[in-house]
């Protein structure tokens, strides 16, 4: 199964995350298929950048986002409140 999840990068106590598409069997920071964005929670304000078209593509072909990624995708208007993909405007 393909998942959209966070891949931790950065230094100790200074996390940054890449939003990646990966096989669910691979380790958290292991092999991945594609990077579709990044999230910097330690910056003020928090920085979130997602390639919406690629996220919609992967969701369309059946990739399952993790709970945290669902919240991030809702924040950038890729998913609606029910978790359905919003068509491009």
Swiss-Prot record:
Annotated gene: rpsP
Ribonucleoprotein recorded as keyword: yes
GO BP term, pick one: translation
UniProt name for this protein: Small ribosomal subunit protein bS16
Keyword Ribosomal protein: yes
Record GO terms (molecular function): structural constituent of ribosome
Pfam families linked: Ribosomal_S16
Family as reported in the entry's similarity comment: Belongs to the bacterial ribosomal protein bS16 family.
InterPro entries cross-referenced by the UniProt entry: Ribosomal_bS16 (IPR000307), Ribosomal_bS16_dom_sf (IPR023803)
Keyword field: Ribonucleoprotein, Ribosomal protein
Parts of the chain that traverse the membrane: none
Lineage: Bacteria, Bacillati, Chloroflexota, Chloroflexia, Chloroflexales
Domain of life: Bacteria
GO cellular component, one term: small ribosomal subunit
NCBIfam families the UniProt entry points to: S16
């Amino acid at each position: 199964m393909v998942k959209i999840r966070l891949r931790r990068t950065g230094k100790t106590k200074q996390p940054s995350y890449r939003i990646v598409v990966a096989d669910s069997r691979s380790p958290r920071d292991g092999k991945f298929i594609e990077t579709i964005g990044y999230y910097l929670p330690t910056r003020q304000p928090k920085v979130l950048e997602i390639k919406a078209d690629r996220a919609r593509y992967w969701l369309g072909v059946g990739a399952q986002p993790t709970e945290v990624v669902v919240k991030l995708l809702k924040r950038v208007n890729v998913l609606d409140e029910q978790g359905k993909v919003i068509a491009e405007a």
